[in-house]
């Protein structure tokens, strides 16, 4: 037993003096390796009598376990020492100003910028933001919005349908954000004042259309909402968005299944210079959005009594009004992931649009 005590002391001293991982490994091999001192002791158990093995077996195995634990503890200690030394060597004074990057690459996409501008304008007018699912049912996308059977929008060439489920029902990618109007009417009681920015999907692709685009819709429901209120809201929005002090707008009769009466809105502009549009001046007109009083059938589908409540709604393409305001000629470039395009048309991340500080500073 004295031999084991002396051997243990020797090995433990070597472990304690080991100053790096390589030395610790050398001590391990010398003690526990195939021909190590502790391993050799274990080999002698086979030549001992049963009585001797009862005494020496636990003693030698206990030594092996203690050496193994000591080696692991020393390795962990050396790792902690190395980490502390590295932290001391590589420490950073966080009180010093950060050096400016050689080039500011990150930019906010124009669509994100325009949605933020829209939120700032309508937020100032007392509206809240509403959202809904991109994958919709036929009921919310068409039926509840007064689209009759056989309407062209229900055809495959205009709408992306999924395969029918086990019940024979087909989900679809929403063709407008109008389904959120129905969901909002179902979920809350009037008065309702919401705007709904979001992605929409239609089977169309050219310089001014893409299969996926962004749309803004608005909805106001209460007991006294009228066309005059709608004209005021839309005029104030267009003046704020295009950042002009005054703006003439023209409301023309139109048709949408979900509104009655339905109107299309043109805004005053000057297109006398090629490739340039100036709003709030000139003798030209440009169609900007569609609007109207919410159809009584839509109110009923939303769970409201049209004899008690009325409202107005409008919709416009976010991508299109972004192109008009910031002079971008091709809608398809919005989705090309070209960093050069984004550096040219994008916005600095910290320039958040506000009515007080300027929408597009």
Swiss-Prot record:
It is found in: Cytoplasm. PROSITE patterns: AA_TRNA_LIGASE_II. GO terms for molecular function: ATP binding; magnesium ion binding; phenylalanine-tRNA ligase activity; tRNA binding. Its cofactor is Mg(2+). It holds the Pfam family Phe_tRNA-synt_N. Transmembrane segments: none annotated. GO terms for biological process: phenylalanyl-tRNA aminoacylation. The keyword Transcription does not apply. Signal peptide: none annotated. One of its GO terms (cellular component) is cytoplasm. Disulfide bonds: none annotated. InterPro entries: aa-tRNA-synth_II, aa-tRNA-synth_II/BPL/LPL, Phe-tRNA-synth_IIc_asu, Phe-tRNA_ligase_II_N, Phe_tRNA_ligase_alpha1_bac, Phenylalanyl-tRNA_Synthase, tRNA-bd_arm. It comes from the Bacteria. Its main location: cytoplasm. It catalyses: tRNA(Phe) + L-phenylalanine + ATP = L-phenylalanyl-tRNA(Phe) + AMP + diphosphate + H(+). Mg(2+) binds at residue 260. Tetramer of two alpha and two beta subunits. Belongs to the class-II aminoacyl-tRNA synthetase family. Phe-tRNA synthetase alpha subunit type 1 subfamily. This is Phenylalanine--tRNA ligase alpha subunit. It comes from Chelativorans sp. (strain BNC1). The gene is pheS.
